[in-house]
Each structure stands twice: as structure tokens, then as C-alpha cells.
Amino acid sequence: MKSINAYTDGSCLGNPGPGGWAVLLRYKNNEKELVGGELDTTNNRMELMAAIMALERLSEPCQIKLHTDSQYVRQGITEWMSGWVRRGWKTAAGDPVKNRDLWERLCAATQRHMVEWCWVKAHNGDSDNERVDVLARGQAMAQRSTVASR
């Protein structure tokens, strides 16, 4: 089973507003960047999309160390999801879980991989985290330009 390091980040200008996500996948000396964006989204949705794309783009089951600066993503998948599912996708307060569509997609994407969820502090000198931050922000800005040109 291949060992992959993934760095993910999401960005949103306005929250809600134009947003972008970015992934850096590293296997041995090989790297691949993945990016995308949406016209009207939130930061949390872009953080989730980055993690989803990191996992979905792997063509075979892998051991993956997924680095995110989003506690929302890390805690959601490692701590909160089992309770949400048990309560029929309701929070502990009884409210519907936000971004359920993406949480379900992320859960499905994890099934064929061995994932270690690693939190990294944002804007704290981690060069790979900074790299995906710049890429995600660039995608959000590109989406904003698309909106402005309409």
C-alpha cells in the first residue's frame, strides 16, 4: 500500500462568496497539485472539498496522512460524525448538520484508504500548508474575477 502525504486547504472571500480549494499530494519524490473553486460557497465547504478531492483522486487504496488546518474537518470526521449518523444527521443540539452532502461524500471517500488526520496550525511556517493556502486563495480570487466579469 502506497504511503501518501496530502496537504489541503480551502478559502472563501466573503463567506459566503467565491471560494477555492487546493490539494498537494506527495508520493516519494512525486507531487501533484489539484485546485478548484465555486462561485458561491463557504470556507467550510471549500475545506471539505479539498479533503474530498485529495482522497477521491487516488486511484488505488493508500495509507494517507492528510494535513489540514481546519479543525472543522479534522474534528468532524474523527469526533463528531459518528454522533451525527447515530442521531440521523442531527447535531447534539438537534439541528440538521450543515454541509451534510459533503460530509457524506468525505465519509465515503475515506472507506478505501487508511487515513491519518493531521491538524497543522495555519500561517505558522509549514511550507506545504502555506503552498496550498496560496493556491486555494488564488482559486477563490479567480472565482471572484468570474463573478465581476458577468
UniProtKB/Swiss-Prot annotation:
Residues 1-141 form the RNase H type-1 domain. Mg(2+) 2 binds at residues 9, 133. GO terms for biological process: DNA replication, removal of RNA primer. One of its GO terms (molecular function) is magnesium ion binding. One of its GO terms (cellular component) is cytoplasm. This is Ribonuclease HI. Monomer. Belongs to the RNase H family. Its cofactor is Mg(2+). PANTHER family: RIBONUCLEASE H1 (PTHR10642:SF26). Pfam families: RNase_H (PF00075). Its main location: cytoplasm. Keywords: Cytoplasm, Endonuclease, Hydrolase, Magnesium, Metal-binding, Nuclease. Mg(2+) 1 binds at residues 9, 47, 69. CDD domains: RNase_HI_prokaryote_like. Its EC number is 3.1.26.4. It is found in: Cytoplasm. It is an enzyme of class 3 (hydrolase). Binds 1 Mg(2+) ion per subunit. May bind a second metal ion at a regulatory site, or after substrate binding. It catalyses: Endonucleolytic cleavage to 5'-phosphomonoester. Endonuclease that specifically degrades the RNA of RNA-DNA hybrids. It comes from the Bacteria. NCBIfam families: PRK00203.1.
